[in-house]
Amino acid sequence: MTQIIDGKALAAKLQGQLAEKTAKLKEETGLVPGLVVILVGDNPASQVYVRNKERSALAAGFRSEVVRVPETITQEELLDLIAKYNQDPAWHGILVQLPLPKHIDEEAVLLAIDPEKDVDGFHPLNMGRLWSGHPVMIPSTPAGIMEMFHEYGIDLEGKNAVVIGRSNIVGKPMAQLLLAKNATVTLTHSRTHNLSKVAAKADILVVAIGRAKFVTADFVKPGAVVIDVGMNRDENGKLCGDVDYEAVAPLASHITPVPGGVGPMTITMLMEQTYQAALRTLDRK
């Protein structure tokens, strides 16, 4: 029988544990983790994501600030704003909500964030640390998926893992984290030949391709673990993932739903990394 991986329940459990750790940290050291989120413009989806991050930070007992700036902000002004928070020791995590307006160079913005405060894990230095086997900040979606594997007792060693999607945010770091657990990893994408046949060999299938219900039953080996990172709308406007859930769920040993699967874990891992960044400042004193 298929086991549903309940990301919402797991995130709530971890969030509760994080609030306890934060309270203890404050009591013992006086340190309160601080997270600042910079939102450029008024993209409706970005506003929802930022609101959720702020809510989670406050629930964890963090100091939280959302800096809203107009879409007309210049790149130089945005970089100056980031520099201000880089230099302020009260803030341990800095997030710039993506996407950014076209006139702003996204890479320049990510490079401007202090790697020790880059809780998204997108800075090239943190990517390099991950690929060299010494991760500090890990992109939060792959980190959340790894936590799911751990919580549900899913063994990765020696397993065939297929990742569909090669983004720097999910696909590439996901592949590296699976490799670190001794899985045999195939990283695929939309131009992979015979993609369904490649995917059908997977014991572990992680799908992050950004296409509604792209993965159907012929992509999935019976008994596979299926992780759906997608967040799309179907033809009826209903939220759905990159996996055709109704067709695939009966085949899988474990599967994440959309919504309520990977999404809640992403924000929880952002909070955990902010907490860890705060802890590391104690080590540097």
Swiss-Prot record:
What name does this protein carry?
A: Bifunctional protein FolD
Species name:
Streptococcus pneumoniae serotype 4 (strain ATCC BAA-334 / TIGR4)
Single GO molecular function: methenyltetrahydrofolate cyclohydrolase activity
Q: What CDD domains does this protein's entry cite?
A: NAD_bind_m-THF_DH_Cyclohyd
Q: Give a GO cellular-component term.
A: cytosol
User: EC number(s) on record?
Assistant: 1.5.1.5, 3.5.4.9
- What does the sequence similarity comment in the record state about its family? Belongs to the tetrahydrofolate dehydrogenase/cyclohydrolase family.
User: Annotated pathway, please?
Assistant: One-carbon metabolism; tetrahydrofolate interconversion
In Pfam terms, one family for this protein is THF_DHG_CYH_C
- The protein's role, per its UniProt record: Catalyzes the oxidation of 5,10-methylenetetrahydrofolate to 5,10-methenyltetrahydrofolate and then the hydrolysis of 5,10-methenyltetrahydrofolate to 10-formyltetrahydrofolate.
Keywords from UniProt, A to Z, are: Amino-acid biosynthesis, Histidine biosynthesis, Hydrolase, Methionine biosynthesis, Multifunctional enzyme, NADP, One-carbon metabolism, Oxidoreductase, Purine biosynthesis
Question: What reaction gets catalysed by this protein?
Answer: (6R)-5,10-methylene-5,6,7,8-tetrahydrofolate + NADP(+) = (6R)-5,10-methenyltetrahydrofolate + NADPH; (6R)-5,10-methenyltetrahydrofolate + H2O = (6R)-10-formyltetrahydrofolate + H(+)
Biological process terms from the Gene Ontology for this record are: L-histidine biosynthetic process; methionine biosynthetic process; purine nucleotide biosynthetic process; tetrahydrofolate interconversion
**Cited InterPro entries:** Aminoacid_DH-like_N_sf, NAD(P)-bd_dom_sf, THF_DH/CycHdrlase, THF_DH/CycHdrlase_cat_dom, THF_DH/CycHdrlase_CS, THF_DH/CycHdrlase_NAD-bd_dom
Q: Glycoprotein: present as a keyword of the record?
A: no
Oligomer and partners: Homodimer.
Q: So where does NADP(+) get bound?
A: G165, R166, S167, S190
Q: Which domain of life is it from?
A: Bacteria
